[in-house]
């Protein structure tokens, strides 16, 4: 799999996607702010989208790009619902720290 897409080798693009995925996973595991955690999850989803598009272009199939549209729609819905929950939790608890939100009791 040593193809070149628009002058960039596929391995470079996959390496970038791996780095983005790793940064996202580290953000989810290390950070305690729920907004940063949501941003890290979005970074993970975007790195997966990059892999889908890369393989779609390298193999000359449209399937990967089609899946990306569905993943983006799901990510947008997840972001909208997640941010609405974060706003509701912040209004009630006055904090976005995950450690302070251990119980789901109001």
Curated annotation (Swiss-Prot):
Family note: Belongs to the complex I subunit 4L family.
Protein name: NADH-quinone oxidoreductase subunit K
Biological process according to GO: ATP synthesis coupled electron transport
Any GO MF annotation of the entry: quinone binding
EC number assigned by the record: 7.1.1.-
Gene3D superfamilies in alphabetical order: 1.10.287.3510
Subcellular location field: Cell inner membrane
Membrane topology recorded in Swiss-Prot or TrEMBL: Multi-pass membrane protein
Free-text function comment from the UniProt entry: NDH-1 shuttles electrons from NADH, via FMN and iron-sulfur (Fe-S) centers, to quinones in the respiratory chain. The immediate electron acceptor for the enzyme in this species is believed to be ubiquinone. Couples the redox reaction to proton translocation (for every two electrons transferred, four hydrogen ions are translocated across the cytoplasmic membrane), and thus conserves the redox energy in a proton gradient.
GO cellular component, as recorded: NADH dehydrogenase complex; plasma membrane
PANTHER family on file: NADH DEHYDROGENASE SUBUNIT 4L-RELATED, NADH-UBIQUINONE OXIDOREDUCTASE SUBUNIT ND4L
Alphabetically ordered keywords of this record: Cell inner membrane, Cell membrane, Membrane, NAD, Quinone, Translocase, Transmembrane, Transmembrane helix, Transport, Ubiquinone
Organism domain of life: Bacteria
Xref: HAMAP family: NDH1_NuoK
Subunit structure: NDH-1 is composed of 14 different subunits. Subunits NuoA, H, J, K, L, M, N constitute the membrane sector of the complex.
Catalytic activity: a quinone + NADH + 5 H(+)(in) = a quinol + NAD(+) + 4 H(+)(out)
Main location: membrane
Spans through the membrane: 10-30, 34-54, 67-87
Pfam families, A to Z: Oxidored_q2
